[in-house]
Swiss-Prot record:
Enzyme Commission number(s) of this protein: 1.1.1.205
Purpose: Catalyzes the conversion of inosine 5'-phosphate (IMP) to xanthosine 5'-phosphate (XMP), the first committed and rate-limiting step in the de novo synthesis of guanine nucleotides, and therefore plays an important role in the regulation of cell growth.
The protein's enzyme class: oxidoreductase
Protein known as: Inosine-5'-monophosphate dehydrogenase
Annotated gene: guaB
MF (Gene Ontology): IMP dehydrogenase activity; metal ion binding; nucleotide binding
Residues covered by the CBS domain: 138-194, 201-258
Keywords from the UniProt entry: CBS domain, GMP biosynthesis, Metal-binding, NAD, Oxidoreductase, Potassium, Purine biosynthesis, Repeat
Cofactor needs: K(+)
Record: residues binding K(+): 349, 351, 354, 524-526
SUPFAM superfamilies cross-referenced by the UniProt entry: CBS-domain pair (SSF54631), Inosine monophosphate dehydrogenase (IMPDH) (SSF51412)
Length: 545
C-alpha cells in the first residue's frame, strides 16, 4: 500500500515537471509581449489588474537568420509625422541634459535635442535662436551690427552666438562693410570700449553675391577670394542674406545632420499647458523652433490634451510639429492621437532619477508601456517615442522592436561634455550633476518663478517646503563628448539589427522576437565571475549599483 502511494506521488511530480517544461519552452518561442503575457503561470486576475508589465531587463531578443551587414543598416526614422532623422535618438528636455550646446551636437549627429523649459520664455527662445543660427545653408536674417557700435559690444554679441564676425549695415540695411576676428586680431582689448566698428571694419573691395546665388557659385566665390563670409545683396545694396564657409565644412563633417529645408539644424523645445504656456509656445515658434513638446508627467490630463489640440488648430503653428507626452498605456496614446499629436512620447517613471512609481505608486514598466502605446500609434501612422529607462544600447533595440520609432535619452547623455550639468570631482573621478525635473532642485524657484512645478501639477504650491518631489538629484560619470557616446550607442543598435536580421528600423518589429528571462538569466547576461580592470566604452557596471 505504501509503495503504491509513493508511485502515485512520483507520477504526479513527473507530470508537473513536464507541464513546467512545456510552459518554459513556449515562452522561449514567444513573438511579442501579448504572447508573453498570455503564458503567465498564474490564475486569471480580476479586471482591476492589468496584464503583466515588463521592463527592458526582463527580456532579450532572439537571434535570427540574417543577411544584414552592421555597417550597412539604415537607422533613419520618423521623429514626427513630417520630420525624419538619420539617428533614432532625442536628448531629454531636462535642465542637466539639454540646452543649446547639446541640441546643436544632437542635430549634427543625426538626432535632435529638446530644450528644457525650466527657464524664462526669453531665455528659452534665445536658446532656439542659437541653435538655428549655429549653421545654415544660407542665413536669410543674419545678425548685423551698426557702424557706431563699440568693439566691446561687438565682442559680447559674437561671444553670445559663437560667431567670428558680422556684416555691417546702415539704418536702411545697406551693406557698408564687414568685420571679422581678423580685423580685431591686433587691437588691444583695453581699446575695445573706445574704438567703434567703423574704425576697423573692412569696407573696401567687399566680396558679395546676388540674393539668388547657387550653392556651387557661392563656394567658388569663397574659395576664389579666400574669404570666410559671403554677404548677399540685392540690386540696391540691401543685405538679404549671408553664406559662411564653415557651413560647407560642417556639411561635409556632419553628413547625417538633422536639418530643415533652409539647411539649418532642427531643434525641439518643451512647453507646458498652464499659465504663460501659450506665450512660451508663440515665442518659441517665432524663434524658429521645429518641434514643440507638450511636456507633462501625465499626458492624459485634459489640459494637456487641450493644449495639443489648440496648437494643432492654430494656423500660426502650421510649420511646427507637436509631440505629446507622457503616457504609459494604449488608451493614453490614443487620446494623444485624437488630440492631434504628431508623435507620442511614452514613459511614466522609468527614468533613473524619477520616483513617480514609488511616491505616487503609478507607472507602467517601460517595455510594456512602449508596446501598448505603439499599438495605437502604428494604426494611426503616428511615431512613438520611448522616453526613459535606457541603460545600454541593447535597450534601444528592445524599444524599437516593441514598436517605438525613436528613444529619448536623459541619464545616458547627462555625463556628456555638452550637457549643462556641473562637472564635479569625486573620489578621483569626474562626474556631472544630473537631476529629475520633479526633484526639489529642479522645482525650486528661478528668480520669482518656478518653471518646472506645473509639469507635476504643483504650480499652485507656493512654498518650497510644501512641494512633493517626484525625482532625485545625483551625479553620473563624466563620459566625454557626445559624438563618442552616440557612436557606441548607435553601434550597438547596428549590431542588434544584424543579429535579428533587420535592414532598417521599420523591419525591427517584424524581425525581432522577445524571450522573457529570469533574474539568473539577467545576471548571466552581464559580465560575471571577473574583476573588471578596464571598462569598455559601451559598458559600465554603474547602472547595476
Amino acid at each position: 500500500m505504501r509503495c503504491r502511494t509513493r508511485q502515485r506521488i512520483s507520477e504526479r511530480s513527473q507530470a508537473c515537471v513536464v507541464k513546467v517544461s512545456a510552459c518554459s519552452y513556449s515562452v522561449c518561442m514567444a513573438t511579442n509581449l501579448d504572447e508573453l503575457n498570455a503564458q503567465s503561470a498564474y490564475a486569471p486576475l480580476p479586471p482591476i489588474f492589468a496584464k503583466l508589465g515588463l521592463a527592458y531587463d526582463d527580456v532579450l531578443l532572439l537571434p535570427n537568420e540574417t543577411d544584414v551587414i552592421p555597417s550597412e543598416v539604415d537607422t533613419s526614422t520618423h521623429l514626427t509625422r513630417k520630420i525624419v532623422m538619420k539617428a533614432p535618438v532625442l536628448s531629454a528636455a531636462m535642465d542637466t541634459v539639454t540646452e543649446s550646446e547639446m541640441a546643436i551636437a544632437m542635430a549634427r549627429n543625426g538626432g535632435i535635442g529638446v530644450l528644457h523649459r525650466n527657464l524664462s520664455i526669453d531665455d528659452q527662445a534665445a536658446q532656439v535662436d542659437v541653435v538655428k543660427r549655429s549653421e545654415s545653408g544660407m542665413i536669410t536674417d543674419p545678425l548685423t551690427v551698426n557702424p557706431e557700435v563699440t568693439l566691446a559690444d561687438l565682442d559680447k554679441l559674437c561671444g553670445k552666438f559663437h560667431i567670428s564676425g558680422l556684416p555691417v549695415v546702415d539704418k536702411e540695411n545697406k551693406l557698408v562693410g564687414i568685420i571679422t576676428n581678423r580685423d580685431m586680431r591686433f587691437i588691444a582689448s583695453e581699446d575695445y570700449d573706445t574704438l567703434k566698428v567703423k574704425d576697423v571694419m573692412t569696407k573696401e573691395n567687399l566680396v558679395t553675391g546676388p540674393s539668388n546665388i547657387s550653392k556651387d557659385d557661392a563656394h567658388r566665390l569663397l574659395a576664389q577670394h579666400k574669404v570666410e563670409k559671403l554677404p548677399l545683396v540685392d540690386e540696391e545694396g540691401h543685405l538679404t542674406g549671408l553664406i559662411t564657409v564653415k557651413d560647407f565644412v560642417k556639411t561635409e563633417q556632419y553628413p547625417d545632420a538633422t536639418k530643415d529645408e533652409q539647411g539649418r539644424l532642427r531643434v525641439a523645445a518643451g512647453v507646458g499647458f498652464l499659465g504663460d504656456a501659450w506665450q512660451r509656445a508663440s515665442a518659441l515658434m517665432e524663434a524658429g523652433v521645429d518641434v514643440l513638446v507638450v511636456d507633462t508627467a501625465n499626458g492624459e490630463a485634459r489640459l494637456a490634451l487641450d493644449m495639443i489640440s489648440r496648437l494643432k488648430h492654430d494656423s500660426a503653428f502650421d510649420g511646427v510639429q507637436i509631440i505629446g507626452g507622457n503616457v504609459g498605456t494604449r488608451s493614453g496614446a490614443q487620446a494623444m492621437i485624437e488630440a492631434g499629436a504628431d508623435a507620442v512620447k511614452v514613459g511614466i517613471g522609468p527614468g533613473s532619477i524619477c520616483t513617480t512609481r514609488i511616491v505616487a505608486g503609478v507607472g507602467v514598466p517601460q517595455l510594456t508601456a512602449v508596446y501598448e502605446a505603439a499599438q495605437a500609434c502604428r494604426a494611426a501612422g503616428v511615431p512613438c517615442i520611448a522616453d526613459g529607462g535606457i541603460h545600454y544600447s541593447g535597450d534601444i533595440a528592445k524599444a524599437l522592436v516593441a514598436g517605438a520609432s525613436s528613444v529619448m535619452l536623459g541619464g545616458t547623455l547627462a555625463g556628456c561634455e555638452e550637457a549643462p550639468g556641473e562637472k564635479v570631482l569625486l573620489h578621483g573621478k569626474q562626474y556631472k550633476l544630473y537631476r529629475g525635473m520633479g526633484s526639489l532642485g529642479a522645482m525650486a524657484p528661478r528668480g520669482k518663478k518656478s518653471y518646472s512645478k506645473d509639469r507635476y501639477f504643483q504650480a499652485d504650491v507656493t512654498s518650497s517646503d510644501k512641494v512633493v518631489p517626484e525625482g532625485v538629484e545625483g551625479e553620473v560619470p563624466y563620459r566625454g563628448p557626445l559624438n563618442a557616446v552616440l557612436y557606441q550607442m548607435l553601434g550597438g543598435l547596428h549590431q542588434s539589427m544584424f543579429y535579428i536580421g533587420a535592414h532598417n528600423i521599420a523591419e525591427m518589429p517584424e524581425r525581432g522576437k522577445f524571450i522573457r528571462i529570469t533574474d539568473a538569466g539577467l545576471r548571466e547576461s552581464h559580465p560575471h565571475d571577473i574583476v573588471m580592470t578596464t571598462e569598455a566604452p559601451n559598458y559600465s557596471g554603474f547602472h547595476n549599483n
